[in-house]
């Protein structure tokens, strides 16, 4: 089973809110998920953190072979999770 880390869309029209989830690559965008690992709010104007990710879960799924989509890859890079993953992978 090919597993991807991707976004599912919530929120209303012109006010998106996304969950960062682990899902089967063949399931629809807002379809069945395996596990939720975080959230992303691109229109948050309050100055708070737009991204919340459970770093341990993200690293676990990356280690197990889940492939992030391009957008999630950028988010994980910005949060420093991919750097941690690369360090763990190359330290062995």
Swiss-Prot record:
What are the recorded GO MF terms, alphabetically? structural constituent of ribosome
**Annotated InterPro entries:** Ribosomal_bS16 (IPR000307), Ribosomal_bS16_dom_sf (IPR023803)
Q: Which UniProt keywords apply?
A: Ribonucleoprotein, Ribosomal protein
Q: Give the UniProt entry's GO cellular component terms.
A: cytoplasm; small ribosomal subunit
Record Pfam families: Ribosomal_S16
Q: Which GO terms describe its biological process?
A: translation
Give the record's family classification. Belongs to the bacterial ribosomal protein bS16 family.
Q: Enumerate the NCBIfam families for this protein.
A: S16
Recorded protein name is Small ribosomal subunit protein bS16
Q: Which organism is it from?
A: Staphylococcus carnosus (strain TM300)
Q: Which gene encodes it?
A: rpsP
């Amino acid at each position: 089973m090919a597993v991807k880390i991707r976004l599912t869309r919530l929120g209303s029209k012109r006010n998106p809110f996304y969950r960062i989830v682990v899902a089967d690559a063949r399931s629809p965008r807002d379809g069945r998920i395996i596990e939720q690992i975080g959230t992303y709010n691109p229109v948050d104007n309050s100055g708070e953190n737009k991204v919340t990710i459970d770093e341990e879960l993200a690293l676990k799924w990356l280690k197990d072979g889940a492939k992030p989509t391009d957008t999630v890859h950028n988010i994980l890079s910005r949060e420093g999770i991919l750097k941690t993953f690369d360090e763990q992978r190359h330290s062995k």
